[in-house]
Amino acid sequence: MIQPQTHLNVADNSGARELMCIRIIGASNRRYAHIGDVIVAVIKEAVPNTPLERSEVIRAVIVRTCKELKRNNGMIIRYDDNAAVVIDQEGNPKGTRIFGAIPRELRQLNFTKIVSLAPEVL
């Protein structure tokens, strides 16, 4: 469960390393975001000499959370970290590589470009 002020790792090579959630896109008063939700975040740490800079406001989609994800078949998936992928206004990833495993629920949410770049889909 991601809420405002939560720090997340970045799971792509866009140039950002750490994000802080400042808003959850969707309903106006949602408290928590889950896997597949789009958030507005600020970059807290970035790689030098990249297009993304520290304190820049961006959009990101959540790909991993420490909170369990329950599937309809009874399977429960839990990750070791909270991670997101930086996206543009159309929902395409800004990076060209994705690091780590991502859930297959992203394919159902029309993030097919992120799923195709991922090395492992659970």
UniProtKB/Swiss-Prot annotation:
Its main location: plastid. Keywords: Chloroplast, Plastid, Ribonucleoprotein, Ribosomal protein, RNA-binding, rRNA-binding. One of its GO terms (biological process) is translation. It is found in: Plastid, Chloroplast. It comes from the Eukaryota. Pfam families: Ribosomal_L14. InterPro entries: Ribosomal_uL14, Ribosomal_uL14_bac-type, Ribosomal_uL14_CS, Ribosomal_uL14_sf. SMART domains: Ribosomal_L14 (SM01374). GO terms for molecular function: large ribosomal subunit rRNA binding; structural constituent of ribosome. GO terms for cellular component: chloroplast; cytosolic large ribosomal subunit. Binds to 23S rRNA. Part of the 50S ribosomal subunit. Belongs to the universal ribosomal protein uL14 family. NCBIfam families: rplN_bact. This is Large ribosomal subunit protein uL14c. It comes from Carica papaya.
